[in-house]
Curated annotation (Swiss-Prot):
The keyword Disulfide bond applies. Glycans are attached at N103, N110, N231. Disulfide bonds join C406-C454. It comes from Mus musculus (Mouse). The lineage of its organism: Eukaryota, Metazoa, Chordata, Craniata, Vertebrata. This is Pregnancy-specific glycoprotein 22. SUPFAM superfamilies: Immunoglobulin (SSF48726). The keyword RNA-binding does not apply. GO terms for molecular function: syndecan binding. Residues 44-140, 162-260, 280-380 form the Ig-like V-type domain. One of its GO terms (biological process) is positive regulation of cytokine production. It is found in: Secreted. GO terms for cellular component: extracellular region. InterPro entries: CEA_cell_adhesion (IPR050831), Ig-like_dom (IPR007110), Ig-like_dom_sf (IPR036179), Ig-like_fold (IPR013783), Ig_sub (IPR003599), Ig_sub2 (IPR003598), Ig_V-set (IPR013106). Keywords: Angiogenesis, Disulfide bond, Glycoprotein, Immunoglobulin domain, Pregnancy, Secreted, Signal. The gene is Psg22.
Length: 475
């Protein structure tokens, strides 16, 4: 932006001279606070987007206003605007992406992480006095940002696929939220971590796997952490533990309880067919719903059954205990008042919350004082709220680029993208951020024109954003 000849003739030939003149005219050390306000539009930013630092309540009778980086250092000037001459002068911190408007607002295009920081607007009156100094902090988040708000580290979880497997079948223990800085991962049979029960380990740096003492020859460990169990038997029922180690030697554990459904088995072994088993109905529940922990194959001569919250059958975790002989019910420390116990051993959880997620344990005792134990995992999620989608520019030229960003107020959700009400088919010109909340089209083509939406979902619900139409223009 060039300075007018009239302005130049008055001696405003450089940014440094402008700042010197302003500093001589103003009482810099004692600025007057006025009612000027600055708002970031939009308030949340991801790399590649544009932002308007919108100014309101600009004082009257101003001569100039100045934008600069930081709070007090005027040598970090971005641009100065002379209201007398309706002309702006760029400063040393002007990157070529900033546009200064007569109303004081500053437009910054294609922001990067380096644009994060304080921005200050100084206004100067016609008599050369500082009227106001107003600052705003601009936060630019990278593509690793969970769009909408910084997300706590995702919890390492394991899912059984399928949820129930018959003897002779295969099951995948699918790992979710594996960290990027992974060094190694180890699988164990049971809840404890020691060498004797190690199934296998995988080193990501070498992309190599080693089998442990508990390896049966039927397991395959994958680089994404998942474990495939083939030709399962009822003896494979039980807990499995995944241990991960990152490059900073920080360890994390996750557990899953595998149930082998012997009732689906083609064999006719009566012993296998009476194995105690629990199914959560439904497998995934929304907050406020009910979950029935449905018991199968309860021993015929059972005398007592006990329910516990967690995997350990100790008094502090006891929910309830029922004696069939005396028809007596005793609630434990972990009883919340929302549980209903049925005479077939099943337990109903009412008005569940996310805190009810986790393992539950059933212990049965028969007339011969034989004890059987079974475990079940409960999964409770919040209902998803509607996400909001933004685009850097809804009208782009062919060969240009555009960034769509999906903002969700929910944590633990997944994101998928829709194009003209269909699942978006990614091309080599498109990239997704690691969390999939940001979609970038690098070289736009005519066929990219249309309506884009993002969908936020978890196992119990999903919501789709309002559509944003992209218009593609010829060069």
């Amino acid at each position: 932006m060039e300075v007018s000849s009239e302005l130049l003739s008055n001696g405003w030939t450089s940014w440094q001279r402008v700042l010197l003149t302003a500093s001589l005219l103003t009482c810099w050390l004692l600025p007057i606070t006025a009612g000027v306000t600055i708002e970031s539009v939009p308030p949340k930013l991801v790399e590649g987007e544009n932002v308007l630092l919108r100014v309101d309540n600009l004082p009257e009778n101003l001569r100039v206003f100045v934008w600069y980086r930081g709070v007090t250092d005027m040598s970090l000037g971005i641009a100065l605007y002379s209201l007398d001459y309706s002309t702006s002068v760029t400063g040393p911190k002007h990157s070529g992406r900033e546009t200064l408007y007569r109303n004081g607002s500053l437009w910054i295009q294609n922001v990067t992480r380096e644009d994060t920081g304080y921005y200050t607007l100084q206004t100067i009156s016609k008599n050369g006095k500082v009227v106001s100094n107003t600052s705003i902090f601009l936060q630019v988040n990278s593509s690793l940002f969970i769009c909408g708000r910084p997300s706590p580290p995702a919890l390492l979880t394991i899912e059984s696929v399928p949820a129930s497997v018959a003897e002779g079948g295969s099951v995948l223990l699918l790992v979710h939220s594996l960290p990027d800085n992974l060094q190694s991962l180890l699988w164990y049979k049971g809840l404890t971590v020691f060498n004797k029960v190690e199934i296998a380990r995988h080193r990501t740096v070498k992309n190599s796997s080693e089998m442990g003492p508990a390896y049966s020859g039927r397991e395959i460990v994958y680089s994404n952490g998942s474990l495939l169990l083939q030709n399962v038997t009822w003896e494979d029922t039980g807990f499995y533990t995944l241990q991960i180690v990152n490059r900073y030697w920080k360890m994390e554990l996750a557990h899953i309880y595998l149930q082998v459904d012997t009732s689906l088995s083609s064999c006719c072994d009566d012993f296998n067919s009476v194995q105690l088993r629990i199914n959560p109905v439904p497998p995934h529940a929304a907050e406020g719903e009910r979950v029935l922990l449905q018991v199968h194959n309860l021993p015929e001569d059972v005398q007592t059954f006990l329910w516990y919250k967690g995997v350990y059958s100790t008094q502090s975790f006891k929910i309830t205990e029922y004696s069939i002989v005396t028809e007596s019910l005793i609630n434990g420390y972990a009883h919340s008042g929302r549980e209903i116990l049925f005479i077939n051993g099943s337990l109903l959880l009412q008005d569940v919350t996310e805190k009810d997620s986790g393992f539950y344990t059933l212990v049965t005792i028969d007339s011969n004082v034989k004890v059987e134990t079974a475990h079940v995992q409960v999964n409770v999620n919040k209902l998803v709220t509607q996400p909001v989608m933004r685009v850097t520019d809804s009208t782009v030229r062919i060969q240009g680029s555009v960034v769509f960003t999906c903002f969700s107020d929910n944590t633990g959700v997944s994101i998928r993208w829709l194009f003209n009400n269909q699942n978006l088919q990614l091309t080599e010109r498109m990239t997704l951020s690691p969390s999939k909340c940001q979609l970038r089209i690098h070289t736009v083509r005519k066929e990219d024109a249309g309506e884009y939406q993002c969908e936020a979902f978890n196992p119990v619900s999903s919501k789709t954003s309002l559509p944003v139409r992209l218009t593609v223009m010829n060069e």
